[in-house]
């Protein structure tokens, strides 16, 4: 098998070539080998101009080899750790006189050179230990057999290697701008806005670049593959093959596939991954997320948690080569949740409260005098609102309130009441709240169970309509208003205007029909009727009835649309 790979290496060394100094690149053969990832995974040969991904078992070194045929050859080698720190070194074993380019086509001589380098320690050119993306670059390298040795002492890990003899023309990694930092331009409780300088690879060289943003709570990442390794830590990709199977321990094609698939055509196991350049939203893990945003260099991250430290990394990906470069990441702590201001309620005084959609509001009621009972009148002007009442930390009440509700609680000397209001998902809410220890004097106007306005169809004329509504046993003032509306006025439009807290003072004087007092001790007879005159034939009108209580506080009945007859 080893001889077979060295034969493949020989195919990359045509004697007539004088430009490439690593295995000379036959483009057609090179592209074929790029597609066949198994060639790289199984081979210890580094091809010229292609990124190799492979795996390291802990404390088990891995060696790669490549040949440089001529002196004064440019050479660049880049190693990218994808998880654990690596120890790696690059060594050179000079060629013997009998192993010149004239004899480079003989696989036996190449095999001898490799064996000599294994047996005899060569000249160390470069070494590094850490988890940074590090590279060796030489504008003039001697001919010889080069060995790259990698070791992971912490844990099993994987990495990437890229080598080329044409570093100036290849440029597969996107170039960083003169200022490679990611800037936090603004941040709040749940959002952070990031900005960075565009890559010259996109702005000057006009190569396709995509930016990917990685957000996590632990630390910044130095490479995109390190971030993706963290995201995929639970995937089968990291599961080592089971012992006893016929596999090369460094053959990545088997990793992550069940045993019953190992006998299938290996070409099915080596399908190329999708281009990173597409708009891919990775399935987020617990504390890390990657979002690719195209060629924009400003991005706002939302839905963050308040008072939490986040780390932000930006990677630019060359969508032609699928290779990436990291900006210098940033971190910031989001702002604390704004402390809720508590509204003080005065005994017997109506307080207007506005609650944002899904928002919260806190109110406090501390009666000055001793009391036996406390009454809360809560008027939800539109949609339902969740109400909680606590006294000295103890929960007394928790209900959804729609319309007008009255709650009477047993009092306690020097008791302090905390009211929490929580808005719903539909939209913002407006309420009127009255807390009192003397409910008989400061009650909201009482309402019947049915607050609809009924129109009598048989009593309709071209200029009038007759309507009726229910009252209560308490003598109250009722005011009725009318407003002409379009014939296609819908129920949805009517609901949008159904703010029960808007009183008669918000209506035009021309819309007022009349006001009258009404009550009945017999609830069965607590019905009043009214005929509204001076209307136009065939027109639609919106009718509203308001009941006014002590202190001028009013409540609106459900609106009613009526239509006069067109022909009489």
Curated annotation (Swiss-Prot):
One of its GO terms (molecular function) is heparin binding. The keyword Signal applies. InterPro entries: FN3_dom, FN3_sf, Ig-like_fold, NDNF, NDNF_C, NDNF_Fn(III)_1, NDNF_N. O-glycosylated; contains heparan sulfate and chondroitin sulfate. It is found in: Secreted. One of its GO terms (biological process) is positive regulation of neuron projection development. The keyword Transmembrane helix does not apply. PANTHER family: NEURON-DERIVED NEUROTROPHIC FACTOR, PROTEIN NDNF. Binds heparin and chondroitin sulfate. This is Protein NDNF.
């Amino acid at each position: 098998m080893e001889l077979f790979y060295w034969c493949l290496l020989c195919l990359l060394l045509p004697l007539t070539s004088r430009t490439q100094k690593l295995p000379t690149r036959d483009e057609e053969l090179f592209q074929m080998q790029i597609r066949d990832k198994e060639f790289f995974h199984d081979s210890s040969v580094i091809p010229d101009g292609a990124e190799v991904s492979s795996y390291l078992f802990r404390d088990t070194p891995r060696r790669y080899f490549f040949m440089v045929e001529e002196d004064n050859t440019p050479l660049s080698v880049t190693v990218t750790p994808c998880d654990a720190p690596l120890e790696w070194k690059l060594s050179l074993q000079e060629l013997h006189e009998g192993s010149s380019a004239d004899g480079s086509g003989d696989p036996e001589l190449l095999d001898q050179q490799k064996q000599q380098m294994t047996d005899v320690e060569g000249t160390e050119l470069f070494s590094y230990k850490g988890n940074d993306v590090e590279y060796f670059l030489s504008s003039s390298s001697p001919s010889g057999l080069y060995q790259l040795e990698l070791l992971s002492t912490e844990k099993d890990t994987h990495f990437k290697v890229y080598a080329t003899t044409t570093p100036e023309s290849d440029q597969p990694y996107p170039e960083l701008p003169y200022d490679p930092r990611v800037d936090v331009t603004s941040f709040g409780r749940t959002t952070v806005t990031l900005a960075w300088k565009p890559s010259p690879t996109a702005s000057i060289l006009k190569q396709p670049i995509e930016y990917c943003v990685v957000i996590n709570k632990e630390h910044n990442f130095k490479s995109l593959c390190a971030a993706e390794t963290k995201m995929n830590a639970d995937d089968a990709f990291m599961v080592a093959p089971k012992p006893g199977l016929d596999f090369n321990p460094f053959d990545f094609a088997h990793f992550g596939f069940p045993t019953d698939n190992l006998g299938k055509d290996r070409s099915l196991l080596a399908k190329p991954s999708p281009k990173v350049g597409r708009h891919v939203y990775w399935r987020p893990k617990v504390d890390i997320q990657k979002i690719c945003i195209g060629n924009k260099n400003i991005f706002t991250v939302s839905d963050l948690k308040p008072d939490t430290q986040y780390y932000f990394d930006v990677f630019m990906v060359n969508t032609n080569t699928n290779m990436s470069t990291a900006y210098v990441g940033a971190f910031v702590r989001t702002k604390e949740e704004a402390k809720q201001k508590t509204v003080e309620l005065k005994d017997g005084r109506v307080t207007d409260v506005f609650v944002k959609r899904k928002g919260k509001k806190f109110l406090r009621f501390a009666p000055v005098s001793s009391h036996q009972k406390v009454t809360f009148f809560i008027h939800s002007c539109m949609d339902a609102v969740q109400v909680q009442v606590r006294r000295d930390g103890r929960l007394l009440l928790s209900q959804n309130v729609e319309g007008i509700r009255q709650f009477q609680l047993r009092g306690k000397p020097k008791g302090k009441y905390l009211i929490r209001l929580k808005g719903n998902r539909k939209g913002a809410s407006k309420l009127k709240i009255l807390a009192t220890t003397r409910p008989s004097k400061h009650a909201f106007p009482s309402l019947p169970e049915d607050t609809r306005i009924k129109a009598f169809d048989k009593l309709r004329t071209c200029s009038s309509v007759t309507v009726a509504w229910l009252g209560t046993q308490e003598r109250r003032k009722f005011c009725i208003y009318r407003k002409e509306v379009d014939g296609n006025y819908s129920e949805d439009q009517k609901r949008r205007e159904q703010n029960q807290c808007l009183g008669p003072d918000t209506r035009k004087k021309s819309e007022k029909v009349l006001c009258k007092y009404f009550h009945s001790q017999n609830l069965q007879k607590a019905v009043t009727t009214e005929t509204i005159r001076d209307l136009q034939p065939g027109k639609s009108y919106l009718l509203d009835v308001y009941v006014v209580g002590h202190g001028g506080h009013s409540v609106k009945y459900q609106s009613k649309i009526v239509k006069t007859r067109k022909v009489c």
